[in-house]
Each structure stands twice: as structure tokens, then as C-alpha cells.
Swiss-Prot record:
Enzyme Commission number(s) of this protein: 2.7.7.6
MF (Gene Ontology): DNA binding; DNA-directed RNA polymerase activity; magnesium ion binding; zinc ion binding
Name recorded for this polypeptide: DNA-directed RNA polymerase subunit beta'
Keywords: DNA-directed RNA polymerase, Magnesium, Metal-binding, Nucleotidyltransferase, Transcription, Transferase, Zinc
Source organism of this protein record: Polaromonas naphthalenivorans (strain CJ2)
Gene: rpoC
Pfam families linked to this entry: RNA_pol_Rpb1_1, RNA_pol_Rpb1_2, RNA_pol_Rpb1_3, RNA_pol_Rpb1_4, RNA_pol_Rpb1_5
CDD domains, per the entry: RNAP_beta'_C (cd02655), RNAP_beta'_N (cd01609)
Domain of life: Bacteria
Length: 1404
């Protein structure tokens, strides 16, 4: 019996493998796969519908059409299995072998494989060291190649045309061999001796850069061939494999027609041309005819492998390009992305969602019909267990009739069985969550309102999919990891995701507001019960100010018990009643205020940190219920009267119109240019709009009421519209402004501002022109949104791909490295506090108390909220913490360097896929970012101009290291440093704020001066940039010639004339001269720079207005010239999504700035045409120089000392330069800060560590510099972890390790250059990746998540990590151990079977 069962058992090969290798197939290998040669192009007989013998669907080669039945019908049934029918030659077996048996075609002439020819760089070209053009000419029979020069002076590998060939044939006769087509190429490949070639190339890695690069490429390729045991001649095919027929099916349609796979067409062409060629060769046809046929065969093989790669694509009957083998695997609808990474899932359904306000957070409502369908296997099992149905068929019938017992069983199997809900697009981890189903009538799924923000769902027709976890393990994972009540924080930033919104917020806000002179004001209550009774009796208003005695519970630190404390609170009725739902341990002060949306979010956060997960979930549910109930009770509604138009509106608008008229008049009389007029008009209207909205908000937000003493007082308004905006429930000041103020300025689709504003608002109504203006720009917004979604999705995909294999693999890597974190301060304002930056990170070095230097926190501790409060109390302003970038774990990250798992609130677990989480956190808000680049101009830039800085706090003044200044004649201090900063310290010497001060600013404070908050620290002219002298002397002009280098400008109004430096190119000057100033001292000599013999020369830039006269005496700190900032081209600022993509792709920005390559003194060399020669000389006398285009803005002047990495030419920095000159830490800081700037502008919070994780992956490859004793080639790019492993092994043997330098790759490049070819091929450029991998004979170690999904295993992350470790441990055991385990398992099984049979016997 047992053996018979084994007979029927499906045979599955052992799935235990650790790696996948790809290579090239030799002709012998292809023949060994094949079950026979396909000789005829026929498919099936049109009369019998049976496959033709030796054709593309031949049953003899590929297997039977019907299970266990030969083609002619002589052998049927299972008893003949394995017999080969003597009449039709078909083996009697299962028909599914037609999916796996391959055939082959013997080619009459060899054909080159197009992938190795045309996929750049051409592998054939590299091996043979010929150009692609030449190889193509040979392959497609346009030229000969010399394969054996014999005794002639011809060179091997040389190309000759037909005429040359004839001439040489006459000259040398048969002394030499030259061939055409793939045969020639094949001969050349066979003639290569890899060992000799490799030696030659290894010795030839010298000479010019280009040559070295080329030789290194060839060397790598040859070594790849040698190592993988692949012969180069296999790149030319002698035998073509034929795909199994069931993978290229022929399907009969109704009406006697057939639908066929394109591959059949392509194969048919190859077979036709091949047979014809074979016949021609047998007939000894003329060379030219055979040659043409060979070329056609080559083309047919090309289009079978990759149609359209060369020449025109082959088309079918309907002019559509045929889908070749290559097209089947690449692209979105190819094998990788469509079938391997994006499978459809069984046991799933989808339906519309509706709101379920009565559900608990961990529940969802599941329609009965859906549940019945989804839980069928469980219902069938129960029916069998209960003995209601004996077979599956009977059970099916039972379920279909829908007897009451079925519904009872459904109730039972659904209990405690979580289901997963998913809303597309699933942009982050919270897009799929598990819930316990509650059966409901109807056909819509009910969703808990609090999880909507995580799913980004609303109830306007959204649909959601339901998936059922089947196995016990899956159910357990769903319950512990995915249950909605376990996911209450966003993994992106650690904020709560279950924050109430809209109605709930409005209800809670209304309840916790206080009102002057409410009913029952001033009453004192003994407890909340009494308040409740007074409220129910109608004696107390919710908003009335009262006093209540309340009990608070606080946790005792020693005993961990809750201890009560009671005190009298001044509060309102609503707040007192709300205090009933507070969990133990949450102080009342948290809700003793008007609860706006932000406050409620904070409240839930505090609750989670203080009271734990369970309490918080219950609390959130209670808040939700109260909010809905109170919003209903409050009865807030809006009417036209609520939209108060400010009284001042008419006068403000009239004033603005008057100003605009004045400017129009100035314009007509030629006093201002058109551009200035436009800017000023836009400015005026912008200001007026703001004034109107200020007046409107002032009027809306306050109302006058009479208090109980009869006085008129002001209180926060109870205007419904104001309450909605103020609470954060819906709407904002900007929207109210459009309803009740004035709509203001509108933008055109190109982003420019229309200068006539809409002065009306929605309450007054718009006229036709105003309506048209407002629709004009709005349409662009809708078009943008569609583009944005696609762009953002693509960014997320690239991010996911680059980090997909980054998993936390160990607890602690033991690194002593880290990066110093301090608060981000810009313009004296703290943009991101130290608290936000270091929360949940591990400390590297002991944190010392700033005053008494005692150890506050030991190294290796993760900072939580309590510790951070200690830090803040002590006033620590910088902490060195571990980051993902400094982690030393190979092929992964360690938990300590990553720190807190933001989505769960504790230290990250081993096995967490932090890479994917980082990619999702950055990609998910992508759709909220803007798409356009901002043109600075018009109103936008006006607001950004600052002309002074003031202190925000009291303290002592200090300056940073690069700050330099001189004292001018008036005794003012003038800044002459490019990157000077004023730092304010408090009395303990801790830095409180720092302000950047521009070149040429006047300092109003001195070092170590004590100042009060609000003091002006420095001021400057915001509209011009000065050129300042550091020394005293008499001005001597050089090259200042009117009409050549300068022009006189006379001001129309004042009549004063100034000299403006002009571009001499326009004046047709031959040599480029630059106007400059030298200083002459009292003795008539040139003033020298102290310590050098350089004269002080100060050059003027084009567009500068000269402020001094020739021969004038100047003192230090005086302004020689001013450059108007208006005159400069305004740079477009790339913002939003494109900026983020640009940073992660590590693109070199256009018009990039230059950084100083070394520390030294600046000088200017001889100018070339249109370029300035900028030189830096270091203390040792080494000189570095760069040519800078004239129009660029050089930030340094002659004789200035610069530090390595300082900006010397204006423009955005190039990340590659930052990495090279300033190192990894500085680069990471740059990318993190820049990305955060974009997101911060949109109000999106993302934790820095996510960006760091991405940067780590961008830096994961290194360039080998000195090869040492390794087998690498200098200049080769390798995986950092792999190289470090190799180096460790070498050190252990006492050999020389390789040295390397860091390499920054953009995310696309980094994804494609990963060691895993499966992951790279499924990302982009599939052909190129696979070609390269096959030639190198690459092994994929299946380390990442993607590779494992593709080969169909559990991913090595989370619970899958344990599975893989156990599997590897089992592989390491020896056979005896394995046998012992198997025997013990079998014994257990037999024992249990014996027990059940005993029980059954007893029962009978």
C-alpha cells in the first residue's frame, strides 16, 4: 500500500539550495537538455488537430498531449506508463512534461548570440578587441576577417572588404585564411588562449588612462571566462534550444482560428531559413546565395533572442513587433516583475469600505458572504470533523445550500482568526494591517476610523482587499506583528498613527474650550460624578469654568505601583468629564487645555510612553467615542453669517490701488523698468492680501462678551468656522481668507504670478474675469498631481531596490565610531532640536555634565524620553551617537547602531528589514512634495531678504574660527570672512544660537560682550554685495577704461554718475582685461600682503558699481565697489521631489560650485579666453589650479587663505566633491540635511536614520586602489563587505591586504551594481545584467529579500531569518545526526498513529 502511495506522490526536487549560479550553455549542454531535434516548422495538423511529427509541437520530442496516452491511441491508461509507442514514438507519461522538455535546432551555420554582440559594452568586441562596427560587418557578411595570416604580412583580426579580399587573393593565393560571418568570429574565439591573454593584459596595465581602463575591462572579462570555465566560442551558437511547447502555447479560439504565442512565429522563421540553408549547402549553391541565406538565418536567430535590438523588429501579420525571448523577461510585464515579484494571492477578496464607528481598534467588519467564501477550507474541515459531510464534495454542497449549521460553523472558525486588510497603493508598512473580523450584513467592509490615516483611506468609494492567513504560523504572525492595535506608531517618525481627525477633533476641542460667564461658572465640585449629575440636570455648561477635586494616579519609581493623589483643579465642566477616560498614570494637566489636533497627538504619544500600548489603545478608542458623541451634541454648523468680512477690507484695497497707480505713473515717465514695476505691483498686492487676512483673523478669533460681574471682556471666539480651523479639524487660515477675506494673487500654469489680484472673496462672489483667472492656474494643479504620483512611485521603487537586502543581523558590532549630533539652528531659530535628533539612538562616548564633568549617561545606552529630559536639564548641547553609517557589521546592520525601532518604541529586533522601512518612510510622503522648480523672482524673493540679525536670547558673544574682521574709519567692525558666524553662549558657556553673517556686514557687537535678547548683532545692505579693502592706501585704478571695461551710468533722478564694470567681450576687445585696484602707500610703493611679496590687487566683477575715484585715500574696511544682487541671474531652486531624487541619485548639479582641493593661499594665474585661472598654493608650495568661467561668481580674492573643502566658487555643492575632500561623515550630513530641508518645507517629519540607511547603501561599494595580495584589479569596484572579508583573511595569513577609497553611487547605479544579479536583473536593464552575469559565471548568494522572493523562499528577515538559520544549521550536521532526528520523528509519528487507532477501536 505504502509503495503505491509513493508512486502517486508528486516528485519535488530537494529545495535546499544556498546559491544560484548563472553561466553560458555549451552546445553539448544544450543537446543534453534536448529530447530531439525540431526539423519542421509545422505546428499542428489542421484536420486532426494533432501535432505534426518533428514539428514545433511534436509529441515524440516533447511528450503526450493527453495524460498517459500516446498519440495514435495504442497505449492508454496508467498501466503502460513509461512505454514508448512503436507506431508513433510517443512516451506514455503525464502531459505536464510538455512544460519542461526542451528540443533543439542544429544550425547549418553558426550564429552569434545578439546579447553578447549588441548589449553595451559589446562582450564580443571586448574579447576580440575589435570595434562593434567591424564585428557587425563580418557577422552580416559585408567584410572578411583574417583568421590565420599564415606567411603573409596581413594581421590577424584585421578586416578587409570584398575588393581587398579579391586583390589579396590574387597576391598571396591560399597562403592565408579570411572568413565571413559567425564562422570567422567563431574561429577567432577558438584561437584565443585565455592564459596567455590574461598574462599579457596583467603586464600591460600601464600607459594612458584610457588604455588602462580598457585593458582592465578586458582583463576582468577574460578572468571571468577562465574562472567560470566558460569558453568564449560559446558566444556563437551552433545549436539553438527550443522552449517547451506548453510555455509557448497554441490555443484554439472559437471559429476554427488559433491564437499563438509570438515565439512560434519566430522559431518557424529560424527553422525555415535553416532548412533552406542546409539544402543550399548540400546542393553546393553559389557562395553569394548561401551567404545571403546565412545572413538571413543570423537575423532570424537575432530576433528570436531579442527582437528589435538590431535593425527593424520582425513583425507578425498585423504589423506588430513580435515578442521575443528577451521581451518575455524584461520590463513591467516581464517574468520578473509580473510573475515572480507580483503574484496574485489565493483566499483574498475586495470590497468597498464604509465606516465602523462602533468597532474596537483591532476589529473590522467583514460581510458574511465574503467570509463564507474566504474561510471555506476551515468550514469544510469543521463539517468533516463534526461528521456532517464525509467528502469535500458533500461539504461544498452543504456550504452552497447555506444551511444554518454552516453559519454557526463560520462564526466559530472566524473567532480569533485575524484577516489582513490592504489598501492600494501600499506605500508603507501600515498599508497592510491585521484585524479580527466581525461578521456583518451587507456587502461592504467596515473599517475602524482611527486606522484611516495609516491606510490613507476615506469613505468616498475606496476599496480594500482582504487576505486570509491560513497556517497557524501565519495567523500568529498576523496577530503579534500586524494587528492594528500593535501598530500605533508611524515607522517613519515614531509619532502615533492613530490620531483622531475631523469630527472627533472638533468634538474634543469644543468640549475642552472655556467660555466666559457660562452656566454654573465658579461652582466647586467634590468629584467628577457630581459634575456629571450637574451637567445632566442642566445646571452646568460644558464650557463653564469650575473647580473640581480630582484624583490622579502616578507610578512610584521604586515599587512600580500606582499611588493616588488628590487636589483641587481649576478647569471646565467638559474637561472634568473627559478626565474620566484618562488611563492611570496620565496626569490631568495633559487635557486641562483646549485640545487641538496637535495636542491630541501629543496626548496619545505621552500615553503610549507612560502607560504602555494596551492602555493607549483603549484610551484612543474611548477618545474616539467621546469625540463623536460630543461633536454631535455640540451641534456645530456653519452659515453665511459666520464668514465675517473685515470692515477694513475696502480701505486696504483702496490704499493698494492708489499705490499701484503711482507706480504705473512712474513707469510711464520712465523712472522704473517694466520688471521693477511688475515686482513692486505684485509686492503691494501680496502685502495687502496679508493685511486683509490679518484683519479678518483678528475679527474672527475674538468676540466681546459680558462676564458675570457685568464687565465687557474679550474671549476666544465660538465662531464655528474659526473653531474648525483653530482645532485643526478642517480648513486653515489660508482657506478662510479666501472665503471671507480676499482671494489675492493667482498664479499662471507656468508658476508666474498674475499681477491683477482677485479682490473679492467667495462670500461676495467672483465676477467672470476673476473666475476665469482662478481656474486658469488651478487646472495645472490637477495635471501636476497625476505626474507626481508616477514620479514618486518610481522614486520609492528605486529606493526599495537599493536597500532591499539591508537587515539587522546582529546585536552589537562593537564600533567606537559615531557622529556628533547637535540641534540644527538656522537664522537663530532652532529648526530641529537636539531632542528630536538623538531620541532613540545609542551613545558612543560617556556624556559628561557640562558644569561638573561628571558622567551623566554611560556609553552604549539608548536614549529614551526620560534620559533626554536629563540631558536637557543639564543643558548638554552635543552628543556623539552611533549611526547606520558608522556601523561595522558586514552584510547588514547591528541593532545598537540603528537604535530604536520607531514603529514599536523599543530597541530594534534582529531580523528587522530596516532598509525597506527606510525606503518606504522616504517614498511614502513623496506624493505630498511639490514637483516644480521654483523661479526666484517676483513676490517670492522679496520676502526672503534679511538685512540684519538679532539675538533671540540673553548671553555672551563669541565668533567661530573662520570669522575675520577689520575696523574701519568710523570705528565699526566690518566682516571680511566668507563663512563667519556669531555664536551666543549662555552663562555656562553652552552654545544657544549661531547666526551666519555675510561678507561686508557691520558688526554691532564685540567678542565676549554680554547682550540681551532682541539686540541687533550685525546689519548689512541686502540688495548689493560689497567688495572691501582690508588695508589702507591710495587707490590706483588699473585697466579701468571708459567704454572698454567700464561704462558711465547717469542716474535720471539724481543726476549722479557711477562707473559700472562691463563685459569687455561685448566691446570686441582682443585680449581679456579685468579692471582692478592696487593700493599705494605714503611712500608711493604698492601695498603688499603682510608676510608675502604679493601686491594687494582687488579685482572688480562684471556688473560691479565702482564706489571710489582714482587717487582717493581709503582706510581698511571701506567699500571699493558694490555688486547689485538684482543684476545676477537668479538661480532656479530645484525643490520637492526632483530635488530628493537628485540627491539620492548623487547627480553632479549643473553650474556646480567649486570646493578648495587643499588648504592654502588663493592667487589668480594667467587668464585664458573666457576663463579665470584660480590657483591655491599650500604651505609646502604644491599648487592646484582650476579654470573658472568668467560668468561664475568667485567667492575668494587674491591672497585669501582657504581651508580644504571650503566653497571658493559660488554654486550648489557636488556630493562627489564633498566625499572626496571632507569624508563620509560630512557627505552624510550634507545629504541628510538637504533631504530634510525639502521634507520640512512640506511639514513632513522623517527620522534622520532612514536617510542615513540609504546613504550607507549608496556607499556600499569601494574602488580598489592598491591590490596587495588580492586577485582584484586596480580601479575595480567591489562590495565593501566582501573586500573587508578578503582583507581579514589575508591579514590572518600575514599577506598584504588591498587598500581602497570610498565610492558614492546614485541609487539606480547602486541597485544595478549589487552582487546579486537576480535582484539587479529584476530592477532595470535586465539584458545587460544577465549578459554580464552569465559571462562572469556569477553566483547569487541569495542574501537579499528580493532574490528570495523570486526563487520562492521565505525572506531572510523577521521570522524568515530564524528559518534560514535553522536550515543552514541542519545542512552543517552530518548524516548520522540527521538520520537520528528523522528516526525519532518517525517513531513519534507511529506512536501517535497507534494511539489514534486504539482510541478508534475503543470507540467502536
Amino acid at each position: 500500500m505504502k509503495s503505491l502511495l509513493d508512486l502517486f506522490k508528486q516528485f519535488t526536487p530537494d529545495e535546499h539550495f544556498d546559491a544560484i549560479k548563472i553561466g553560458m550553455a555549451s552546445p553539448e549542454k544544450i543537446r543534453s537538455w534536448s529530447f530531439g531535434e525540431v526539423k519542421k516548422p509545422e505546428t499542428i495538423n489542421y484536420r486532426t488537430f494533432k501535432p505534426e511529427r518533428d514539428g514545433l509541437f511534436c509529441a515524440k520530442i516533447f511528450g503526450p498531449i493527453k495524460d498517459y496516452e500516446c498519440l495514435c491511441g495504442k497505449y492508454k491508461r496508467l498501466k503502460h506508463r513509461g512505454v514508448i509507442c512503436e507506431k508513433c514514438g510517443v512516451e506514455v507519461t503525464q502531459t505536464k512534461v510538455r512544460r519542461e522538455r526542451m528540443g533543439h535546432i542544429d544550425l547549418a551555420a553558426p550564429c552569434a548570440h545578439i546579447w553578447f554582440l549588441k548589449s553595451l559594452p559589446s562582450r564580443l568586441g571586448l574579447v576580440l578587441d575589435m570595434t562593434l562596427r567591424d564585428i557587425e560587418r563580418v557577422l552580416y557578411f559585408e567584410a572578411y576577417v583574417v583568421t590565420d595570416p599564415g606567411m603573409t604580412p596581413l594581421k590577424k583580426f584585421s578586416i578587409m572588404s570584398e575588393d581587398d579580399f579579391d586583390a589579396k587573393r590574387k597576391e598571396y593565393g591560399d597562403e592565408y585564411t579570411a572568413k565571413m560571418g559567425a564562422e570567422g568570429i567563431k574561429d577567432l574565439l577558438e584561437g584565443l588562449d585565455l592564459d596567455i591573454e590574461i598574462d599579457k593584459l596583467r603586464n600591460d596595465l600601464t600607459g594612458s588612462e584610457i588604455k588602462i581602463k580598457k585593458n582592465a575591462k578586458r582583463l576582468k572579462l577574460m578572468e571571468g571566462f577562465k574562472k567560470s570555465g566558460i569558453k568564449p566560442e560559446w558566444m556563437v551558437l551552433d545549436v539553438l534550444p527550443v522552449l517547451p511547447p506548453d510555455l509557448r502555447p497554441l490555443v484554439p479560439l472559437d471559429g476554427g482560428r488559433f491564437a499563438t504565442s509570438d515565439l512560434n512565429d519566430l522559431y518557424r522563421r529560424v527553422i525555415n531559413r535553416n532548412s533552406r540553408l542546409r539544402r543550399l549547402l548540400e546542393l553546393k549553391a553559389p557562395e553569394i546565395i548561401a551567404r545571403n541565406e546565412k545572413r538571413m538565418l543570423q537575423e532570424a536567430v537575432d530576433s528570436l533572442l531579442d527582437n528589435g535590438r538590431r535593425g527593424k523588429a520582425m513583425t507578425g501579420a498585423n504589423k506588430r513587433a513580435l515578442k521575443s525571448l528577451a521581451d518575455m523577461i524584461k520590463g513591467k510585464s516581464g517574468r520578473f516583475r509580473q510573475n515572480l515579484l507580483g503574484k496574485r494571492v489565493d483566499y483574498s477578496g475586495r470590497s468597498v469600505i464604509t465606516v465602523g464607528p462602533t468597532l474596537k481598534l483591532h476589529q473590522c467588519g467583514l460581510p458574511k458572504l465574503m467570509a463564507l467564501e474566504l474561510f471555506k477550507p476551515f468550514i469544510f474541515a469543521q463539517l468533516e470533523v463534526r461528521g456532517i459531510a464525509t467528502t469535500i464534495k458533500a461539504a461544498k454542497k452543504e456550504v452552497e445550500t447555506g444551511t444554518p449549521v454552516v453559519w454557526d460553523i463560520l462564526e466559530e472558525v472566524i473567532k480569533e482568526h485575524p484577516v489582513m486588510l490592504n489598501r492600494a497603493p501600499t506605500l508603507h508598512r501600515l498599508g497592510i494591517q491585521a484585524f479580527e473580523p466581525i461578521l456583518i450584513e451587507g456587502k461592504a467592509i467596515q473599517l475602524h476610523p482611527l486606522v484611516c490615516s495609516a491606510f490613507n483611506a476615506d469613505f468616498d468609494g475606496d476599496q480594500m482587499a482582504v487576505h486570509v492567513p491560513l497556517s497557524v504560523e501565519a495567523q500568529m504572525e498576523a496577530r503579534t506583528l500586524m494587528l492594528a492595535s500593535n501598530n500605533i506608531l508611524f515607522p517613519a517618525n515614531g509619532e502615533p498613527s492613530i490620531v483622531p481627525s475631523q469630527d472627533v477633533v472638533l468634538g474634543l476641542y469644543y468640549t475642552t474650550r472655556d467660555r466666559t460667564n457660562g452656566k454654573g461658572e465658579g461652582l466647586v465640585f467634590s468629584d467628577t460624578g457630581e459634575v456629571r449629575r450637574a451637567f445632566d440636570a442642566g445646571e452646568l455648561d460644558l464650557n463653564a469654568r469650575i473647580s473640581v477635586r480630582l484624583t490622579e494616579w502616578s507610578k512610584d519609581k521604586e515599587t512600580n505601583e500606582f499611588v493616588p493623589s488628590t487636589k483641587l483643579w481649576e478647569t471646565t465642566g467638559g474637561r472634568a468629564l473627559l478626565s474620566e477616560i484618562l488611563p492611570k498614570g496620565l496626569p490631568f494637566s495633559n487635557i486641562n487645555k483646549a485640545l487641538k489636533k496637535k495636542e491630541i497627538s501629543k496626548l496619545i504619544n505621552v500615553s503610549f510612553r507612560k502607560c504602555g500600548l494596551k492602555e493607549t489603545v483603549v484610551f484612543a478608542d474611548k477618545l474616539l467615542q467621546s469625540g463623536f458623541r460630543l461633536a454631535t451634541k455640540a451641534g456645530i454648523s456653519i452659515c453665511i453669517e459666520d464668514m465675517l468680512v473685515p470692515k477694513e477690507k475696502t480701505s486696504i484695497i483702496a490704499h493698494a490701488q492708489k499705490e499701484v497707480k503711482e507706480i504705473e505713473q512712474q513707469y510711464t515717465s520712465g523712472l522704473v523698468t517694466a520688471g521693477e514695476r511688475y515686482n513692486k505691483v505684485v509686492d503691494i498686492w501680496g502685502k495687502s492680501g496679508d493685511e486683509v487676512s490679518k484683519a479678518m483673523m483678528a475679527q474672527l478669533s475674538k468676540e466681546k462678551v459680558i462676564d458675570r460681574h457685568g464687565n465687557l471682556v474679550e474671549q476666544d471666539s465660538f465662531n464655528s468656522i474659526y473653531m474648525m480651523a483653530d482645532s485643526g479639524a478642517r480648513g486653515s487660515a489660508a482657506q478662510i481668507r479666501q472665503v471671507a477675506g480676499m482671494r489675492g494673487l493667482m498664479a499662471k500654469p507656468d508658476g508666474s504670478i498674475i499681477e491683477t489680484p482677485i479682490t473679492a472673496n467667495f462670500r461676495e462672489g467672483l465676477n467672470v474675469l476673476e473666475y476665469f483667472i482662478s481656474t486658469h492656474g488651478a487646472r495645472k494643479g490637477l495635471a501636476d498631481t497625476a505626474l507626481k504620483t508616477a514620479n514618486s512611485g518610481y522614486l520609492t521603487r528605486r529606493l526599495c531596490d537599493v536597500v532591499q537586502d539591508l537587515v539587522v543581523t546582529e546585536d552589537d558590532c562593537g564600533t567606537l565610531d559615531g557622529s556628533v549630533m547637535r540641534a540644527i539652528v538656522e537664522g537663530g531659530e532652532v529648526i530641529e532640536s537636539l531632542r528630536d535628533r538623538v531620541l532613540g539612538r545609542t551613545i558612543v562616548e560617556d556624556v559628561l555634565h557640562p558644569e561638573n564633568r561628571s558622567v551623566l549617561i554611560k556609553a552604549g545606552v539608548m536614549l529614551d524620553e526620560d534620559l533626554i529630559e536629563e540631558l536637557e536639564a543639564a543643558g548638554v548641547d552635543e552628543v556623539k551617537v552611533r549611526t547606520a553609517l558608522t556601523c561595522e557589521t558586514r552584510f547588514g546592520l547591528c541593532a545598537k547602531c540603528y537604535g530604536r525601532d520607531l514603529g514599536r518604541g523599543g530597541l530594534i529586533n534582529i531580523g528587522e528589514a530596516v532598509g525597506i522601512i527606510a525606503a518606504q518612510s522616504i517614498g511614502e510622503p513623496g506624493t505630498q512634495l511639490t514637483m516644480r522648480t521654483f523661479h526666484i523672482g517676483g513676490a517670492a524673493s522679496r520676502a526672503a531678504i534679511a538685512s540684519s540679525v538679532e539675538a533671540k536670547s540673553n548671553g555672551v558673544i563669541g565668533f567661530n574660527a573662520p570669522m575675520r574682521y577689520v575696523t574701519n574709519g568710523k570705528g565699526d567692525l566690518v566682516v571680511i570672512a566668507r563663512s563667519g558666524e556669531i555664536i551666543i553662549h549662555d552663562e555656562h558657556g553652552r552654545e544657544r544660537e549661531r547666526h551666519k553673517v555675510p561678507y561686508g556686514a557691520t558688526l554691532t557687537v564685540k567678542i565676549d560682550q554680554t547682550i540681551k535678547a532682541g539686540a541687533i548683532l550685525a546689519n548689512w545692505d541686502p540688495l548689493t554685495r560689497p567688495i572691501i579693502t582690508e588695508f589702507a592706501g591710495k587707490v590706483q585704478f588699473e585697466n579701468v577704461e571708459e567704454g572698454v571695461t567700464v561704462a558711465k551710468q547717469v542716474d535720471d533722478v539724481t543726476g549722479l554718475s557711477t562707473l559700472v564694470v562691463i563685459d569687455p567681450k561685448r566691446r570686441g576687445a582682443t585680449k581679456v582685461i579685468r579692471p582692478q585696484v592696487k593700493l599705494i602707500d605714503a611712500t608711493g610703493n604698492e601695498v603688499k600682503i603682510p608676510g608675502t611679496d604679493h601686491s594687494v590687487t582687488i579685482g572688480f566683477q562684471i556688473g560691479a558699481l565702482v564706489q571710489v575715484r582714482d587717487g582717493q585715500d581709503v582706510g581698511p574696511g571701506e567699500v571699493l565697489a558694490r555688486i547689485p544682487i538684482e543684476g545676477q541671474k537668479t538661480r532656479d531652486i530645484t525643490g520637492g521631489l526632483p530635488r530628493v531624487a537628485e540627491l539620492f541619485e548623487a547627480r553632479t548639479p549643473k553650474d556646480k560650485g567649486t570646493l578648495a582641493e587643499m588648504t592654502g593661499t588663493v592667487s589668480f594665474g594667467k587668464e585664458t579666453k573666457g576663463k579665470v585661472r584660480l590657483q591655491i598654493t599650500d604651505p609646502e608650495g604644491k599648487v592646484w589650479e582650476d579654470l573658472v568661467p568668467k560668468e561664475k561668481n568667485i567667492l575668494v580674492h587674491e591672497g585669501q587663505v582657504v581651508n580644504k573643502g571650503e566653497s571658493i566658487v559660488d554654486g550648489p555643492a557636488d556630493p562627489q566633491d564633498i566625499l572626496r575632500l571632507l569624508g563620509v561623515a560630512e557627505l552624510a550630513r550634507y545629504i541628510v540635511d538637504e533631504v530634510q530641508d525639502v521634507y520640512r518645507l512640506q511639514g513632513v517629519k522623517i527620522n534622520d536614520k532612514h536617510i542615513e540607511v540609504i546613504v550607507r547603501q549608496m556607499l556600499r561599494r569601494v574602488v580598489v586602489e592598491n591590490v596587495g595580495d588580492t586577485s582584484y584589479i586596480a580601479g575595480e569596484q567591489v562590495e565593501r563587505s566582501a573586500l573587508l572579508d578578503v582583507n581579514d583573511a589575508l591579514r590572518a595569513d600575514g599577506k598584504i591586504p588591498a587598500t581602497f577609497s570610498n565610492l558614492l553611487l546614485g541609487i539606480t547605479k547602486a541597485s544595478l551594481s549589487t552582487d546579486s544579479f537576480i535582484s539587479a536583473a529584476s530592477f532595470q536593464e535586465t539584458t545587460r545584467v544577465l549578459t554580464e552575469a552569465a559571462i562572469m559565471g556569477k553566483r547569487d548568494e541569495l542574501r537579499g529579500l528580493k532574490e528570495n522572493v523570486i526563487v520562492g523562499r521565505l525572506i531572510p528577515a523577521g521570522t524568515g531569518m530564524a528559518y534560514h538559520e535553522a536550515r543552514k544549521a541542519k545542512d552543517l550536521m552530518d548524516d548520522s545526526e540527521r538520520r537520528a532526528i528523522a528516526e525519532s520523528e518517525a517513531a513519534e509519528l507511529e506512536a501517535s498513529q497507534a494511539e489514534t487507532s486504539d482510541e478508534n477501536a475503543a470507540a467502536e
